[in-house]
Amino acid sequence: MSDLSHIRNFSIIAHIDHGKSTLADRFIQICGGLSEREMEAQVLDSMDLERERGITIKAHSVTLHYKAQDGKTYQLNFIDTPGHVDFTYEVSRSLAACEGALLVVDAGQGVEAQSVANCYTAIEQGLEVMPVLNKMDLPQAEPERVKDEIEHIIGIDAGDAVLCSAKSGMGVPDVLEHLVRVIPPPQGEIEAPLQALIIDSWFDNYLGVVSLVRVKHGRVKKGDKILVKSTGKVHQVDSVGVFTPKHTEMPDLKAGEVGFIIAGIKDIHGAPVGDTLTLSSTPNVDMLPGFQRIKPQVYAGLFPVSSDDFEDFREALQKLTLNDAALQYEPESSDALGFGFRIGFLGMLHMEIIQERLEREYDLDLITTAPTVVYEVLLKNGDTICVDNPSKLPDLASIAEMREPIVRANILVPQEHLGNVINLCIEKRGVQRDMQFLSSQVQISYDLPMNEVVLDFFDRLKSVSRGYASLDYSFDRFQVANLVKLDVLINGDKVDALALIVHRDKAHQKGRALTEKMKELIPRQMFDVAIQAAIGGQVVARTTVKALRKNVLAKCYGGDVTRKRKLLEKQKAGKKRMKQVGSVEIPQEAFLAVLKVDS
């Protein structure tokens, strides 16, 4: 075996706001990756969106050189991971390239559901997990309680957890020292044929596809001809290097290292994430086990406001898909909105982020329809189909049963907020599976319908628990449910983009709330606009946007009642004629009203 004992590959697992990006900044400062002038808070969160929202969305990598107390200089390859539940697959990708992970826990708040889930992923992949308690400078830090929680909830020994404060820099060198001792070096053979895993890739307008890779065996240098295993295409390497976090070219990348490869690949699908690279001279190297393809949980239609932008929109989506392996899309057309795409997302945050990235980075104006989850429908002829768009639902007469996706949700919540959280879960049709009392927190697990979870469950959970509850969920199974399709009719015409699939018990209430909401949003016309919610042929709710009308009696001072009646009848006839030919413009807010209706 080649000597790779000076290399350490690790990533940081932490819940949102537990300080992993700040800790990364401290590592970069201590190892001198950037000069004082270039240093800014959250160096690795390079997207404007990440900085504004204060969350990490994409995985980033940095190579640092750390001179340890034993006199050796270690090469630390650090891969930053996101902490939000919607980006779990980014985490599993980052972990596939590491031998160890730092579990960063806020010493004041304690363990949160998200870190638990990511920590299990790390342990399953055989990584060495090293606990670190952050935010020790806060007065409310309780290291002993949090160590107990780590041992109880996650089940790893936290006796020698390192205490630090990334903000003030206290204890950060201890973290690095500990890391070099605890995390094992990579295994690999430099002289063997090249075998490298693509962790991430993104599209650069000048360079083509830039791939972030972890080299398992062998080496790759500029001028090599590389073969992408899944496509079978050969490309010539233009440059290889690492991020320190600056883009730094290197003569070569060797086994055990993490860095980037640019090979002038112009085809967006040329280097899929999770693929294996090798040299064209050794084409029969085995594929590395990648990571499972992630299935989108939420689907929504996105349509360009002006139909001329359709091609630009398609191109923008292709570039984003390269960078975001979880995006899936297919063309869709709607009577109300024209041509667009039906896009699959991992959750609501993911959807918002993608929409914002499309609008900002590619300068598009988009309309989004209400998101839905995937339902399984068993037809009377025995076929089973998956429906991700309410307007594609077959006729009710041909459906034998409908099944909705159920998620298993794990919620960690302080005891004083337990009652509120349980009420929320019951309101969302949840079934309790398990409850465990840990020192000051309670861990409850519920089976919840996914369509109740994806829309606003996360926000509601935070508000009923004053921000202390944390949530992690994963798809469990499909279960038969009494579901119906709720259509919205405006002046008797169905608007396909507003259809919803809802539980029959909630259909009337949802229909009423939705029509009331639409009434506020649709501007008044010169004629009455009827807004109806219907299940099949049965109208369950109706409101009317009253017409704007001129006061035709203003010129009559006194006089005979028949004169007034004649003028009113004439106006009425005019309005009736108008209603037959008039069409109603539906504003963008109305399409999103569907989300805002609290069931």
Swiss-Prot record:
CDD domains: EF4_II (cd03699), EF4_III (cd16260), LepA (cd01890), lepA_C (cd03709). Coiled coil: none annotated. One of its GO terms (molecular function) is translation elongation factor activity. Signal peptide: none annotated. The keyword Plastid does not apply. Residues 5-187 form the tr-type G domain. Belongs to the TRAFAC class translation factor GTPase superfamily. Classic translation factor GTPase family. LepA subfamily. This is Elongation factor 4.
